[in-house]
Regions:
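Catalytic Tyr-X3-Lys loop
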Residues: 85, 101-121, 140, 157, ...
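Short C-terminal tail/terminal secondary-structure segment
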Residues: 97, 229, 240-253
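Residue(s) in the substrate-gating loop at a strand-loop-helix junction
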Residues: 144
């Protein structure tokens, strides 16, 4: 298995895409360290995964937008696992949907904080950890195909994810000499709990959206996870600085 004896840290791992990434890595033999702000859901996920997998699964609830909080969580993980071989920064959120001109400064700050700064904070500490310890590694940041196509009525989120793409490629250029790879996975609409809740209220919106996806269905979190797992593995050793869309073909519809 491609992740046998490897330790991987995943943020935003309590549910949705982050949980799917954890499952995909576990399927390939990884030990995983799961971080999320939602302690209750995180603990439930850990219990579920431990019932399904035999490898080492640990978790810690923390505020991922705060560098001190994340650094503390990171080094608690180092104390337990000794070393990390890969990181996936999956945690993100958007504060509201609406016309561009209706967003307040508070909406802007909250969305940028939860969709861009959260990646910047974690990436900075991960790179520092790898470089300080003279380690190689692979990092995958989760973006969105809205960063490429734009996203009507969620413009701040789309712009924040475009910033994630550019940050990732910029950092990839800086750290490649240390044999640290940084890539981006850009999901389309994935069947997460939040998406399910929205479409339960707006079933016609789901039907309309699915028509714009070449495969005519929403994605599953494990499908994002499988791509991330590959990028975190040595099988992707010559892939660096790339933005990989996993969206059922919606970005070329």
């Amino acid at each position: 298995m491609e992740h046998s004896q490897r330790n991987i840290l995943i943020t935003g791992a309590a549910q949705g895409i982050g949980k799917g990434i954890a499952q995909a890595c576990l399927d390939q033999g990884a030990n995983v360290y799961l971080l999320d702000i939602n302690e209750e859901v995180l603990n439930a996920t850990v219990s579920e995964l431990r019932s399904l997998y035999k490898t080492n699964i640990e978790a810690f609830a923390c505020e991922l937008t705060d560098d001190k909080s994340f650094k503390n969580a990171l080094y608690k993980g180092v104390d337990h696992f000794s070393v990390f071989h890969g990181f996936c920064n999956s945690a993100a959120s958007s504060q509201g949907i609406g016309p561009f001109e209706t967003f307040s400064d508070k909406d802007f700050d909250a969305t940028v904080n939860l969709s861009f700064k959260i990646v910047w904070t974690c990436l900075k500490e991960e790179i520092t950890y790898l470089r300080d310890n003279k380690l190689t590694g692979s990092i995958v940041n989760i973006s969105s195909n809205s960063a490429i196509r734009g996203y009507a009525f969620n413009s701040i989120y789309a712009a924040s994810k475009a910033a994630v793409n550019n940050l990732s490629q910029s950092v990839a250029k800086e750290v490649a000499r240390d044999q640290i790879r940084v890539n981006v996975v850009s999901p389309g609409t994935i069947n997460t709990p939040g998406v399910e809740a929205y479409f339960a209220k707006e079933p016609s919106a789901k039907e309309k959206l699915e028509k714009t996806i070449l495969l005519k269905r929403l994605g599953d979190p494990i499908e994002i996870g499988n791509t991330v797992s590959f990028l975190l593995s040595d099988r992707s050793s010559y892939i660096n600085g790339q933005i990989i869309s996993v969206d059922g073909g919606s970005s070329i519809y």
